[in-house]
Amino acid sequence: MNYRLFYAWSEFVEKIRQFFRSKGYLEVSTPILQSYPNADPHIEPLKVNLTLKGQTKSYWLHTSPEHAMKKLLAILPKDMFQITKVFRNGEYGRLHRPEFTMLEFYKIGTDYTGLIEDLKELLNLFGFEDFQILELEKAFEEYLGIVLSEEEEILKNNLMAYGYDFDDREDWETIFYRLYVELERCLASEKPTFLIKFPSKLAMYGVVKDGYAERFELYIKGIEIANGWTEERDPQKIRERMKEWVKDRDLPIDEELLQALPEIPEFSGCSVGLERLFMAVYNIESLDQIPWIFREEGL
């Protein structure tokens, strides 16, 4: 076991804390156990049954502190950040664990470009100085030779024209994410790359403007490090998205979050996988090399 990594991690996290404090962000803590689950697509929350006052009730371990922090922002509209453990069911591999450390931060009065600027400054502290910002459509054309379209039939026709194999029964999202995995392999350079302007179908909690989601993802050495967007504050739009996300899943919709959204001034938010960023900074190939990370056999 490389015990020096414990010291490196301590300094790494403290440097991040000091950076956000110096920028005027408030560090906050919110409960890991939540009454409502995060309803994100492709992420499965962990359910916990607790006995309280003689009655058993279901709670969820948060997959991110997003919902709780947004509820806090509704009553305390201030730039804020949190560093916390998060939990996701069914994730295990070189870059995935059911438990990991997340940095979540929110910035009032700015769109997602303000988050990118703060991330650039943060990355400067760890020796990253040269950055690339690339629109997702252009990335598909440059690296994969594919013209991306949100229309399923047009995308399939484009793939046939470029000689890509696919099952015609596959839907748009399945095809997109298969191609996206190929794109990730092309982003293996040392230069941090911000992919911006996502398809509106993939807006998540973000604003859609001029046909694109105001969303970005940060890649370093082919690893997704961060994910952020200009936050959508219209509860009806988010409700419709959440209904789609929880369809065929036994998950309730967080009504408290929907009530909070209109109370928040214009803002943007970002999540960062800290072990992954640590890997990029210290040239670590796998989460297996990080001694404190969750593993099947324990520490």
Predicted regions and their residues:
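Short secondary-structure capping/junction motifs at helix and strand boundaries
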Residues: 25-28, 78-83, 128-131
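Hydrophobic face of alpha-helices
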Residues: 13, 17, 116-123, 239
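A translation/RNA-centric and nucleic-acid-associated enzymatic feature enriched
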Residues: 31-36, 43-71, 81-108, 151-299
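Conserved, well-structured core segments that form or line functional sites
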Residues: 145-148
